[in-house]
Each structure stands twice: as C-alpha cells, then as structure tokens.
Amino acid sequence: MTKTHIETYELVEECLKINYFGMKYLTEALLPLLESSDSGRVVNISSNAGRLRFLNNEGLVKELDDINNLTLEKLDDLVKSYLKSFKEGALEENGWKLPGGFGTYKASKIFVNAYTRIAAKMYPNLYINCVQPGHTQTEGSSCTGSQTIEEAARSPVMLALDDSGRTGLFYDRTEITAYY
C-alpha cells in the first residue's frame, strides 16, 4: 500500500481477485489433494484490518458472523454486493464504508476470514485457519512494518505444522483471537 491511495473500480476488482478469489480458487483446486491427506492444512493470510468490528453495519456483521447459516454462495453474493456498491458510489449507503483508508483491502480480508470459517465447517477433517502475521516490511506496507518477512512467516508456518485439531480460527500472530 502506498501513502497516496485512491481506489478505482479496476483496483477494487484487482484487490478482491487477488485477496479473496485467488485464495478461494487455489484452496478449492487443492481440496482433493488435501482431503486425501491425513494432515491437510490451509492457512489463509489475513489482517487485523479484516475484523468484523470495522464494519459499521450491524446487519452485515450479523450475516458474516452467522457461521451456521453463512454459505459460500451467500459470501460470494456479499462480495458482489460490495463491488456493486463501490461501482454505484454507495458503499456508505449500503453499509460497506470502512473507517480509514484501504477500504477494499479491509473488506477483502473480512471475506477471507468468513471463507476460512465456512471452509473449516465444510471440511472438518482439515485444519483450516487464518492468521494475521503482523505489520511486515514489504512493498505493500512501504517497508514500514515492525518485523521482517522472516519474522512474519513464523505464525503461518506454526499453523501449517500444528496438530492441535483446532480449525476455523483467527490467529493474531501465534495467539487465537476473535474475528471481532
């Protein structure tokens, strides 16, 4: 992310294609292999910015948090709703306005977190979790992160090797935390 950031529809689409759809399609492509393993793991990279508490719409929060009724189809409809709202200039009106900058990045991580929970429910024999590894020194953060890439890799690697049986969880580095 750069210091000056203006979201265009093309950039919004690109962000969602990379952060949400890319993760989703890769996971779905690998599921047959993961299911045939006795130790299948999926570790999705998220962000503290993707927590539900940043949504100012109680209805959207409730829908995204209702893991018993949220489906992949409903989640994809929510992603489409976000895109449509952006295109129509109606993010705030439709409850998608997120505080601060980088709204689509935040929304994409909210969608990643929801997908993680749905997939964990659908595939109980796999360990599917998401992690926010912390603010990292990358081009995306203009190298302002507080940790190196090597340091940030510790938490995803920990989850990839974890045998605890825990699934569908959100980790803040190495600690389980709430999706809020």
Residue positions per predicted region:
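Flexible domain-boundary/linker segments
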Residues: P32, S47, G59-K62, N129, ...
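Catalytic loop of short-chain dehydrogenase/reductase
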Residues: T2-L16, E35-K121, Q132, C143
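A short, exposed helix-loop element centered on a Lys and neighboring polar residues
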Residues: T27-E28, R117
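C-terminal helical subdomain
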Residues: Y25, I110, C130-T138, S142-Y180
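Catalytic cores of secreted/periplasmic or lumenal enzymes
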Residues: N125
